Curated annotation (Swiss-Prot):
The lineage of its organism: Eukaryota, Metazoa, Ecdysozoa, Arthropoda, Hexapoda. Component of the ubiquinol-cytochrome c reductase complex (complex III or cytochrome b-c1 complex) that is part of the mitochondrial respiratory chain. The b-c1 complex mediates electron transfer from ubiquinol to cytochrome c. Contributes to the generation of a proton gradient across the mitochondrial membrane that is then used for ATP synthesis. This is Cytochrome b. CDD domains: cytochrome_b_C (cd00290), Cytochrome_b_N (cd00284). The main subunits of complex b-c1 are: cytochrome b, cytochrome c1 and the Rieske protein.
Length: 378
């Protein structure tokens, strides 16, 4: 019997097994769309970034003006720049929803897939941070100064490490050049890590909303989920284009329209909105090293989930108390994002500290309450 080319061809067969003939659970909801949406975001970022890099100059005397030149003089440069900046915001919205789905439905039990996902999250956060420095506005410069300075909290090695990252005794031309280099290369490392993420996922198959084995009820990925994904693509792209064409600088910081000036500190230094929750956690610890540890742990704590799973069911769909706790945690993250944008004064400091405790408490108490609920129903 003649097999189709997509099965016979050595390269097409890989694509076929990932996108066409992949057996997928018949009942996965729209919450499973974010993986493909993230891939779309990554492609948008790589393509717009590639064209921006053709016109950008990584030099402290030229960087700000080169971004200005892109927006004013390059054909559709304004569109490339705003698509890239807002594309990053959509990337993080999709990542946070993707992670939230994984926590809710117990997808973290695919341990290798989950751990690679946590690594991807760190890589994407690093990439976005370095990208924010490139326009060399006030917030770019001071954001880079404050965040890189956190390395000095590391005992013994700290000061040397900071000067090594800076390439000197302050954030200067060497810093901008290396940040541009890393910002260019990291998305391709993210792309490679994404392929490993997908490889691990296809070893086990997808989870589903009821968390049971779905081998008896699988359907081919194409046409069912290709079309479902395309609907997601259209919706997200439309919202992104509307934002870019109506209010492209809504999510940015006005201070970044002022060229970087080492002699003038902005009133309130803050990162992009998608890092504010972690920034609020960092600020809520009144100790430099403690703050840095809390900052890293706010993301790294996701890696403990597969090893601290005590329930009889896969997700929290069948645990009413844990569902309430989950949504409290979601609201906590939103409130932390708001606190991160507020000045360091009362009552914001205290509220930030309370929210930080609630955030970390979720990961500690959630499995224990699940265990208690299981025992209650035995």
């Amino acid at each position: 019997m003649n097999k189709p080319l997509r099965i016979k061809h050595p390269i097409l067969s890989i694509t076929n097994s990932a996108l066409v003939d992949l057996p997928a659970p018949s009942n996965i909801s729209a919450w499973w769309n974010f993986g493909s949406l993230l891939f779309l975001c990554l492609m948008i970022q790589i393509l717009t970034g590639l064209f921006l890099a053709m016109h950008y100059t990584a030099d402290i005397s030229l960087a700000f003006n080169s971004v200005n030149h892109i927006c004013r003089d390059v054909n559709y440069g304004w569109l490339l720049r705003t698509m890239h900046a807002n594309g990053a915001s959509f990337f993080f919205i999709c990542i946070y929803l993707h992670v939230g789905r994984g926590i809710y439905y117990g997808s973290y039990l695919f341990t290798p897939t989950w751990l690679v996902g946590v690594i991807i999250l760190f890589l994407v956060m690093g990439t976005a941070f370095m990208g924010y420095v490139l326009p060399w506005g006030q917030m770019s410069f001071w954001g880079a100064t404050v965040i890189t300075n956190l390395l000095s909290a590391i005992p013994y090695l700290g000061i040397d490490l900071v000067q090594w990252v800076w390439g000197g005794f302050a954030v200067d031309n060497a810093t901008l050049t290396r940040f541009f280099t890393f910002h260019f290369i990291l998305p391709f490392i993210v792309l490679a890590a994404t392929l490993i993420h997908i490889l691990f996922l296809h070893e086990t198959g997808s989870n589903n909303p009821i968390g049971v084995n779905s081998n008896i009820d699988k359907i081919p990925f194409h046409p069912y989920f290709t079309f479902k994904d395309i609907v997601g693509f259209i919706m997200m792209t439309m919202i992104l284009i509307l934002l870019v064409l109506i209010n492209p600088y809504l999510l940015g910081d006005p201070d970044n329209f002022i060229p970087a000036n080492p002699l003038v500190t902005p009133v309130h230094i803050q990162p992009e909105w998608y890092f504010l929750f972690a920034y609020a956690i960092l600020r809520s610890i009144p100790n430099k090293l403690g703050g840095v540890i809390a900052l890293v742990l706010s993301i790294a704590i996701l890696a403990i989930l597969p090893f601290y799973h005590l329930s009889k069911f896969r997700g929290i769909q069948f645990y009413p108390i844990n569902q309430i706790l989950f949504w409290i945690m979601v609201v906590t993250v939103i409130l932390l994002t708001w606190i991160g944008a507020r000045p360091v004064e009362e009552p914001y400091v205290l509220v930030g500290q309370i929210l930080t405790v609630i955030y970390f408490s979720y990961f500690m108490f959630n499995p224990l309450i699940i265990k208690w609920w299981d025992n209650l129903l035995n």
